[in-house]
Amino acid sequence: MDINKLIAMFAKLPSFGPSSSRRIVLHLLRNKEEIMLPLASGIQDLAFQAKECPVCFNIDVKSPCSICSDTKRDHQLLCIVEELGDLWAFEKGKIYQGVYHVLGGTLSAIYGIGPDQLNLDSIVERIKKFNVQEVIIGIGNTMDGQVTTHYITQMVKELGIKVTRLACGIPMGGEIDYLDEGTLSAALSSRYIIS
């Protein structure tokens, strides 16, 4: 592979343009032993070991994932998040001790994303199986997020469990994975019942 091909590959990653990709490749080439070779090996190992958790749709090297397997977590507290990055934002802050359910996006009429394209089917079954007592809707406060929240609320309404949504700290139109830990912690602490 030539250097320009590697630069082009980095440029495909989010937040990386041609200039930053060139700088990264140059840095890697100058630090082959300390950074480039271990990075290449780590990426290759992870590519073969990472798998989607069959329970929550997290990505981990364990199946079920280390969160779903953790007996110290509260399995009766289920936080439904839009994307994997949202789960990681909660975990980074170490502010939540329940379990998660990653949807893989939000319902969107504009983009043609319906319930069949998201991980929605298994929510009710999971609530029943693990005797979930509270569902926390941890979805961004966008228009699509609000539609998805309403859909999930209607799905679990008949189960008679508490359904809450993150409150203060999330601006209208805001995305969860862009929030700092303090804002996310405040939002989690002040969630409110919607069903």
UniProtKB/Swiss-Prot annotation:
Q: Name one GO molecular function term.
A: zinc ion binding
Q: Where are the zinc fingers (C4-type)?
A: 53-68
Where is the signal peptide, in residue numbers?
Answer: none
Q: Which processes are annotated in GO (biological process)?
A: DNA recombination; DNA repair
What region holds the Toprim domain? 76-171
Cross-referenced CDD domains: TOPRIM_recR
Gene3D superfamilies cross-referenced by the UniProt entry: 3.40.1360.10, 6.10.250.240, RecR Domain 1
Q: Which domain of life is it from?
A: Bacteria
Q: Give UniProt keywords alphabetically.
A: DNA damage, DNA recombination, DNA repair, Metal-binding, Zinc, Zinc-finger
Q: Which InterPro entries match?
A: DNA_Rcmb_RecR, Rcmb_RecR, Rcmb_RecR_Znf, TOPRIM_dom, TOPRIM_RecR
Family note: Belongs to the RecR family.
- Described purpose of this protein according to its UniProt entry: May play a role in DNA repair. It seems to be involved in an RecBC-independent recombinational process of DNA repair. It may act with RecF and RecO.
UniProt-recorded name of the protein: Recombination protein RecR
Organism equals Ehrlichia chaffeensis (strain ATCC CRL-10679 / Arkansas)
